[in-house]
Amino acid sequence: NLKQVNIAIRKFHTIYNLHRYIVITPYESTLYFKDAFCDCDYVEIIDENKVLNKKKFNELCAEFLKVKNDHKLFRINWYYQQILKLTYTLNYKNFPGKRIIIWDADTVPLKKIKFFNEEDNPILYGSKYEYHIPYFECNNILFGKKIIYPKLSFVTQFAALNSRMRKDLKNVLVKYIKSSNITFDKYYAAKAVLHSISIKHDNEPIYGSHFSE
């Protein structure tokens, strides 16, 4: 991924005037990334464990999903990546009061994309290609009500959020944690998502895809 990330960020920097780029990577890769971007003072490399401790996440998976048959088939590493991004995004100490863009590491921008409109609200991009019902089932549990969604997937290679949306999403998950009598701590996002997966019905096998950030 190092080569792709290097190309993507340098391409991004020629298209956009962004404040800072954050690369979150496993600890063993941090030195390689720092060397690759040693000439870029606008790039910061972060060990993923400082955002979401992987050992603790594994423990939470075992705790919340033990009620599921074949819970050992749960795709821990894949879900870790989803919740890692969510955890970083919801920490308001990261770029307080600013808009942020989450960008997949294996994606290179080819031309400028408009992320926000004139009212500072994110522009939504969707397609029918990856419309996946279990994602929306988890959302309904987390939001505490059934929402009528368009039959589109908003799973793209990026996500744009403004400051208000980040705060609102955090409030939704905190409310869910409290209503479910789950202990609130810095792992609240992981707990909320894993709990919602644990109580949803089993249309999708446990090794399937139940949630996407």
PLM regions with names:
Residues L84-G126:
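GT-A fold catalytic core of metal-dependent nucleotide-sugar glycosyltransferases
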Residues L18-S29, I45-V51:
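Short beta-strand/loop segment that forms part of the nucleotide-sugar
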